[in-house]
Amino acid sequence: MTVDARGHRCPVPSLRLRKALEGRAPGVQLTLLATDAMARIDVPFLMRELGGRVVQIDETDGVLSITVETGDALTD
């Protein structure tokens, strides 16, 4: 699944990602697309808070592609 938050400033990308992660089983991967550079900081913080992890961060033509994986805390 891809969460497209291009054109939005933080905290919107993190909020959209959080909503998309709710109720997902552990080990599920999602990718966030964002153009706000703060997502590079906010998303890893969010994933630590939720018990998940950042798998990969790439940037192409000003678009961040951040792949995350759910952890156990998201199903509680």
PLM regions: where:
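Generic N-terminal amphipathic, Lys/Arg-enriched alpha-helix
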Residues: 1-3
